[in-house]
């Protein structure tokens, strides 16, 4: 309430009152009141987008770092190399780009859209000769077995990514093994070249444990007609390990596992397939902390 003979004045553009002294009043009381200021800021922050490498061999993985942006909206990444999703890592965002064994050699563009602004980065894929391997004819699979595999495994390729769960090198699931068919090799049967292998088949010692390659969450554990006893572990950031032809299973869907933990028992053979989304990548660099999965690992 104002003293008698005082006026309330509102200045143009303001939302609060101010006291104006009436000079006709002698010995006015000391004015008291409060002040309120409001400001509106527009902050324009430009993101920084960096690749772990500009040249990548077939079978490899490149990391994409996105920093210097505000807000919680995830950046969007588009590339013909595969489906790529971003996750929070440290103070920024991280995505991983696969170069499948059959990715076309040459330049590939990754378009990163952040807050309506698009950044283009070029990744050059280098060809790699994975060699050939003699194999026995594989028995034809039934349509029912193929459909069962598609219904249970293919949906995992496009699941939303979870936070990064691995730390350091991955572990080969079999401690003792001999490689029968390696990643990327052309399979030769009776002198005729066939398809390339997108997985690695190992000769293993029956009864030994099958180990989790890294920390993660089991997203599938069960028996399939096409691949036998199967375990799929989600390691975060779209990286998943697919372990086929186990003798026994010792984990269930939804279970959290640690690196080296037994997820089952090995039979005579183990097929392992490491994927980023739906694209298989070379497993051996993962066991040696080599490649984009280990670039600036803490963000």
Where are the model-predicted features located?
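Extracellular and organelle-lumenal recognition/adhesion modules and their flexible linkers in secreted
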Residues: 1-37
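Conserved, short, structured surface segments that act as functional micro-motifs
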Residues: 231-234, 255-299
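Cationic-aromatic interfacial patches
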Residues: 43-122, 127
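Short, well-structured beta-strand-loop connectors
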Residues: 209-219, 251-266
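Surface-exposed, glycine-biased beta-strand/turn segments
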Residues: 122-227
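Short strand-edge motifs at loop-to-beta-strand transitions and within beta-strands
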Residues: 35-37, 93-97, 200
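Zn2+-dependent peptidoglycan hydrolase active-site motif and core
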Residues: 198, 212-247, 269-272
């Amino acid at each position: 309430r104002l003293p008698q003979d005082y006026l309330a004045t509102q200045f143009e553009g303001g939302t609060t009152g101010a006291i104006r002294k009436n000079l006709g009043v002698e010995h006015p009381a000391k004015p008291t009141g409060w002040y309120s200021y409001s400001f509106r800021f527009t902050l324009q922050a430009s993101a920084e987008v960096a690749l772990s490498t500009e040249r990548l061999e077939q079978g490899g993985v490149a990391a994409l770092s996105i920093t210097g942006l505000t807000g919680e909206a995830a950046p969007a990444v588009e590339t013909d190399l595969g489906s790529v999703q971003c996750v929070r890592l440290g103070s920024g965002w991280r995505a991983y780009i696969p170069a499948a064994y059959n990715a076309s050699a040459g330049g590939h563009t990754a378009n990163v859209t952040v807050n309506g602004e698009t950044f283009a980065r070029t990744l050059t894929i280098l060809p790699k000769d994975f060699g050939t391997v003699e194999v026995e004819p594989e028995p034809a699979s039934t349509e029912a077995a193929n459909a069962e595999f598609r219904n249970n495994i293919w949906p995992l390729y496009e699941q939303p990514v979870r936070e990064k769960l691995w730390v350091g090198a991955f572990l080969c699931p079999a401690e003792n093994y001999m490689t029968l068919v390696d990643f990327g090799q052309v399979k030769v049967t009776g002198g005729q070249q066939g398809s390339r292998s997108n997985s690695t088949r190992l000769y293993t010692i029956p009864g030994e444990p099958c180990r989790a390659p890294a920390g993660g969450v089991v997203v599938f554990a069960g028996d399939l007609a096409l691949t036998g006893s199967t375990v799929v572990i989600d390691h975060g950031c779209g990286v998943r390990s697919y372990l086929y032809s186990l003798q026994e299973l010792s984990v269930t869907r939804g279970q959290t596992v640690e690196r080296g933990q037994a997820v089952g028992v090995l039979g005579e053979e183990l097929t392992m397939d490491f994927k980023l989304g739906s694209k298989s990548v070379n497993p051996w660099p993962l066991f040696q902390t080599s490649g984009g999965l280990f670039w600036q690992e803490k963000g």
